[in-house]
């Protein structure tokens, strides 16, 4: 009997770990199921936006809806909290539109990696302990996707080139 209970406990722990891992990654989300405040913010901010990809995940205790979309020929992204607060807005830009100081920071991290898609990001709110907190002033950041030796990563730097988020190099999926 103790052996069966031990296995049951082990199975419960395993299932709990699977649940934790599953909930820490974003998952595709159907646009028709968006909470009304999120849908309203997106439609108001981007009336000509066409959603290409929509994911949802909990970040720092806040449900975030991550939109990848286009408006005309411009590729954009935005993160909107479940209460309808636009946390961040992103515009895909050419590499040469990144200011010199920011590009210097990107190149220092790249260390010979091939730089791909680049982004201009404006963050208006921080997420902390389940709360959406307005920043004193929006923060401008730049991101660059990179590849090297069969791996891909993304670096995010502040306008002055200081690394805000270092890349996590992961194998390129085929």
Q: PLM features: what roles do these ranges have?
A:
Residues 1-13:
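Bacterial N-terminal signal peptides that target proteins for export
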């Amino acid at each position: 009997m103790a052996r069966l209970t031990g296995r049951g406990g082990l199975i419960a722990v395993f299932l709990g770990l699977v649940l934790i891992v599953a909930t820490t990654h974003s998952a595709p989300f159907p646009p028709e199921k968006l909470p009304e405040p999120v849908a309203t913010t997106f439609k108001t901010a981007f009336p000509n936006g066409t959603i290409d990809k929509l994911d949802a995940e909990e970040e720092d205790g806040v449900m975030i809806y991550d939109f990848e979309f286009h408006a005309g020929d411009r590729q954009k992204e935005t993160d909107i909290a479940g209460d309808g607060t636009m946390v961040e807005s992103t515009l895909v830009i050419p590499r040469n539109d990144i200011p010199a100081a920011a590009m210097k920071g990107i190149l220092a991290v790249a260390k010979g990696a091939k730089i791909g898609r680049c982004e201009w990001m404006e963050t208006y709110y921080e997420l902390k302990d389940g709360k959406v907190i307005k920043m004193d002033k929006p923060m401008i950041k730049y991101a660059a996707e990179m590849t090297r030796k069969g791996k891909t990563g993304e670096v995010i730097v502040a306008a002055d080139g200081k690394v805000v988020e270092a890349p996590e190099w992961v194998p390129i999926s085929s």
